[in-house]
Structures are given as C-alpha cells and as structure tokens.
Amino acid sequence: MRRLSPLARRRLERFRGNRRGWWSLWLFCALFALTLGGELIANDKPLMVNYQHSLYFPVFKRYTEQQFGGELPFQPDYRSDYVRQLIDKGDGWMLFPPIPFSDDTPNYELTIPAPSPPSATNWLGTDDQARDVLARVIFGARVSILFALALTFISALIGITAGALQGYYGGWVDLLGQRLLEVWSGLPVLYLLIILSGFVEPDFWWLLGIMALFSWLTLVDVVRAEFLRGRNLEYVKAARALGLSDRTVILRHILPNAMNATLSYLPFILTGAISTLTALDFLGFGMPAGSASLGELIAQGKQNLQAPWLGLTAFFALALILTLLVFIGEALRDAFDPRS
C-alpha cells in the first residue's frame, strides 16, 4: 500500500468498498486454487501409502506393483482388492483423497446402469460412462479457467500493442490498421473452427491459438481511443520535446493511463473465453473426447434427460464462475471510473 500512488490507493479502496466485487474476487481465487489442487481432492491414487514402515506418495510419484510386493512392473490399481491385500500384508495403510476417483476413473462397482444418481460414493452422481461428476466438474473448471487466463493474457498483449501503435502514430498506420480490423473481425470464428476441426483434432493449444487470433479485437478500440487522446496531452508533447524515444513515451507516459480502461475489460474477456470453450465442447468441436469439460457434461445432460444432475451440476458450476467474474468486472469498472 505504501508504494502505491495516491490515485492507485483510491482505486483500490473503491474496489474494496464494493463488497460484492471484493468478495467475488476472493471466492473466485479460492475456487481456482481448489481446482489447481484437484489431484489432492479427486484422485484414484492415494495421497499417502504406508508400506513396511515406509511412506510413499503415489499422487506425486509413480510406483510399480513390485514395490508393494506384487509381480507386475506396472503402476498398480490402488483401488483393487489385490493391491489392498498387498498393502495389508506389509502392515500398511492407504490414505485416499475425499473423492477416490479421478476425472477419467469409472466406478465399476455401480449397482445400477450409468448414469447413476448422487450417492455416498459419488456425491454428485456419475456420467454416462460411470465417471464421477464432481471430479469432472473440478478438472473441467480448471481447464476452462486456465484456458481463459491464457487467452486473456495473449489477447491483452496483442490488443494493447495494436491499439497503442494505431493510436500513437495515427495517419496511415491507423487507417491501415482499422481496415485490417474490419476485415478480420468479419470472419466467422465459429464456422472457421468447425471447418478446421474436420482436418485437425482440436486440443487445448490448438483451440488457444485459433481463439487468440480473434479475441484481441475487442481491446484494440479501447486502447486506440486512449492513445489518440493521450498523445495530444501537454506532458506527452513535453516528453517528445525533450527528445524521448517513441518507445519510452508509449510505455512510460501513455500506456499506464490507457491501462485503466483496459483492466476493466479483462474480466469480461475471461467470461467470453470460458463461454466460448464451453459452447465448443457442447457442440463437440472443443477439447478431445474424454477430456473433463463443463460443456461436455452439459451435452451429456441434454442426451440423458432422465439424469438431471448432469446438466444441472455443470450449469451451476459455469453460472457461478461467470457470475463471480461479472461482479469482479463491474467492481473494477467502477473503481477505475474517473467520475467516481
């Protein structure tokens, strides 16, 4: 706080004064941290194994069945009765996470056909392949948030650079940039993704690269407007008169003020990225088949109307994430509003 400028401190206080946005930020960070530690919460491997008075940590390191008295040089199925008997013979025990299933682990002990309703074993039920719904929500939310954060960072980097160059130099640079933006923004992104998915199997990085080609367009106009206004201010003219380079003027004197409007847009870019990935997964053009995904879970709910817990769980998880981001974005917008 002491190193912040008076203006930055006022903005921080205004943001903290918005209780809805402030607590939404903390709740979103807590949920994100929860998903990052998903392997410690939902996993078919134990957190800790005590075997012959030695400790093993299968979550962090791969062990073979032979290390626990078995015969095969492969990773054991810790949930099987055979491995449990091996551990018991070694006077040991296993400590499993609260959810003893990973996102791709089927529950072979179901007494009814999948998808099965919520139970003491599967708290939110299973999907149509007997996989734990809560585990898939945790890992699916992590993929969505990481995808959105990466896409937002790339979009901000490209959008701020393009908008700064257009607004600062103006003239033919601005004119050419605007014409290119008009053409580029007119391309149908969804149809392009559908067409390309027929030639290349989509994955995380492939989708990120394609979406990054278009998601930066929304920031360009905001940054461009700030630079068009800022380049004519007196202190910018004075910096030029002193012989400072264009790079120094852009980075030190105009960009910090232009970031005020840009920061308030970032949460909404996050929501757009999460919604887009969910929609693509729902349509079957997103993450590879079998990947944990909120959109894929919603699609399963549509195909299995007799199992409402599938669609409702994914819907509420998605709605919670998007609502928190919208509240954070509104609080940031109010905090950076010069009229407040």
Would you name each region that the model predicts?
Residues 1-156, 160, 164-165, 300, ...:
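Gly/Trp-centered helix-boundary motif
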Residues 126-340:
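Alpha-helical transmembrane segments of integral membrane proteins
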